[in-house]
Amino acid sequence: MKGRGATLEVEDLVLTFGGITAVKSVSFTAQASELLAMVGPNGAGKTALLNCINGIYRPQAGSIRLDGIDVIGRPLHTMAELGIGRAFQHAELFPHLTVVENLLIGRHAKFRAGLWASGIYFGKGLKEEVEERRQVEEIIDFFELYRHRDTPVGALPFGIQKMVGVARALALEPKLLLLDEPCTGLIREERENLARFLLRISHEIGPTILWVEHDMQMVSDLAHRVVVLNHGAKIVEGVPDDIRRAPDVIAAYLGQASV
């Protein structure tokens, strides 16, 4: 599963809904294989920005480039082909399907022979089906999900469902992995377990990771750099230690409390 991360360049991005500006001329770059965290209070524009990157929203101005390729305006279903994978805040899984089946769906963009050949299991379609299942088993091993591989996702604990959501995004072998608050709703033990896997993904697989998170301690422990948004605008970016001490961050995101 080892791969190469892509360079993500966001420049002067603007997104509006009616008279409300959700993203205000935001610019930043995530270097190849960087673990870049994005933080900010609720309503800061973090999820809206992710929605622009993977094609759910189309911004009114600015550019988004992945290894120099402009991704704005491309059909949503082509984002996986470009190398963009995403785990949503709410896992967005198929609850009646097993873990294996959800991960196979996550690899849909990797199938080359077409639905007809794959569906009747012969020739090139059969070979691709075998390869897809082999790749899925590797992901199951990586995330230590073998006990749950044949369990319907809806029957799993919430923390395991969140892990399956990240695993399904990784099943695309993305160059850019978007994580939207993967720790939301998790207890401390589950958060620590997810942090362990984020480090493994970064170190052992190597996609570029853009990670929206509220847990500043986890961000400080894991992220290479941090971008801070407030009211749709970027107020600062830098390494975690500098971000924790930045007056603008303390005032806008954390109140007057020390971090």
Ranges and model annotations:
Residues L8-V10, V23:
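Conserved structural motif at the start of ABC-family nucleotide-binding domains
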Residues E173:
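Conserved catalytic motifs of ABC-family nucleotide-binding domains
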